[in-house]
Amino acid sequence: MSTHDPISDLITRIRNAQMRSKSKVSTPGSKMRANVLDVLKAEGYIRGYATVEHPSGRSELEIELKYFDGEPVIREIERVSRPGRRVYASVKNLPRVNNGLGISVLSTPKGIMADHDARDANVGGEVLFTVF
């Protein structure tokens, strides 16, 4: 089954798995999803992920979710820019999530990165989603 919005699909799978207290969740593999997961891992929101190759040639990403005292580390994950309504922000207008306690994940000309990395690199871009 093809998805029209792979980022929303990834976010929904993570949110649903954490509501059910799953330790792992899998999603179809792609470079964009892997780059988003790299950011989430670097920021400490997931334990990690692995690429699983199937004999049919398709790949899946198996994500290890992270919990602290039995509660999900990701309290809130919300899509900002959607295919029907794109949201772009310059470096001066990058949103702060809960006064800096959360992050915004952006797609910039220099790749997918967290908001504080985009500020350091002095680039803006499309605000994909926020995590708290």
Curated annotation (Swiss-Prot):
GO terms for molecular function: rRNA binding; structural constituent of ribosome. A modified and unmodified form exist; the nature of the modification(s) is unknown. The keyword RNA-binding applies. One of its GO terms (biological process) is translation. One of its GO terms (cellular component) is ribonucleoprotein complex. The keyword Zinc-finger does not apply. Keywords: Ribonucleoprotein, Ribosomal protein, RNA-binding, rRNA-binding. InterPro entries: Ribosomal_uS8, Ribosomal_uS8_CS, Ribosomal_uS8_sf. Belongs to the universal ribosomal protein uS8 family. Part of the 30S ribosomal subunit. Contacts proteins S5 and S12. One of the primary rRNA binding proteins, it binds directly to 16S rRNA central domain where it helps coordinate assembly of the platform of the 30S subunit. This is Small ribosomal subunit protein uS8.
